[in-house]
Amino acid sequence: MDRISGLPDEVLVKILSFVPTKVAVSTSILSKRWEFLWMWLTKLKFGSKRYSESEFKRLQCFLDRNLPLHRAPVIESFRLVLSDSHFKPEDIRMWVVVAVSRYIRELKIYSSHYGEKQNILPSSLYTCKSLVILKLDGGVLLDVPRMVCLPSLKTLELKGVRYFKQGSLQRLLCNCPVLEDLVVNLSHHDNMGKLTVIVPSLQRLSLSTPSSREFVIDTPSLLSFQLVDRNDNSHTFLIENMPKLREAYINVPFADIKSLIGSITSVKRLAISSEVGYGEGFIFNHLEELTLWNKYSSNLLVWFLKNSPNLRELMLVSETDDHENLGMLSWNQPSIVPECMLSSLQKFTWFKYLGRPQDRDIAVYILKNACRLRTATIKSDTRLFTKLEMITELRLSSQASSTCELNFS
């Protein structure tokens, strides 16, 4: 220890940066040489979801006493994991004020919420010029003041927070001129109503909702879009601008998203879970990779095969909660072999394959008609004897591609 203590402060602080903040703080009891070294750390994380009430009280006393004395001129990252039943909002606001005064770059707060969500964010945070990443999760009330300017903010994550007014989020977004990544996980009582996302600089957008929503999206620079509906609701979409979109993940099993589907036809990669048809007039000319989750119907598979002329890779995932009704319940074979089967499809993978007659018919159809297929991989969790039967059935089927490698696992 004496040999280590003889190292320069910069080296010791660098060593401390590789251990959890709690461990770094504990080194202050080693000697006077170590007493204040942790205060030069630029990345701080305090709290835990597993803390007891007494541990949270000790943490509060520690932060009240020591955080204002922190010596690092810049705090790169400040993370708090709290239980709001043990902290007053004004205490948390004071800690964030200190972090803002040290030109904070990343702020992440998780607050478990047992009662009414609290406003724990100081007004100074909304004008922090150095802030690049802001992540809020749980018991947080977002009360956006009139004065907002976050010129450096590139990543914003809001999970389960409540909004003071319906326009709070939009006011915040309007004042983030370089925002690139946005994650919004809504809740039943978030006070949001219509969700409006108008951000010219945005490149990646992820939305999750447990209830019916109206979405207004204008994101001309968007490259990646994710939408998750946790309760099979209906939604209204007004999408003005997504010309650069390259990948999308859509998990809305029973929602009618015809108003959305026309805005994602430019994607190269698409993962989608849906049981609702989309009608005619949509062509995915750029789509190369498609992942489909289907419980009940093969109609969506047929629809995409017909409307994706340049598809190169197809992945199917069988999903169900009822073991007696596994797999797609119907297979309506296309009357004409889709263009992608004849000219572009090279890779086919089926996850959780169960070998029911309709599943087998789909797999056999693809093997029989995909002329350019290079690999077909069937992954199954069934018993060994059943799996051997599946393998035999598919190996005996005819294949349009003489170079196709058929794999089972």
UniProtKB/Swiss-Prot annotation:
Coiled coil: none annotated. Pfam families: F-box, FBD, LRR_At5g56370. It comes from the Eukaryota. SMART domains: FBD (SM00579). Residues 1-47 form the F-box domain. Residues 330-379 form the FBD domain. This is FBD-associated F-box protein At4g10400. It comes from Arabidopsis thaliana. The lineage of its organism: Eukaryota, Viridiplantae, Streptophyta, Embryophyta, Tracheophyta.
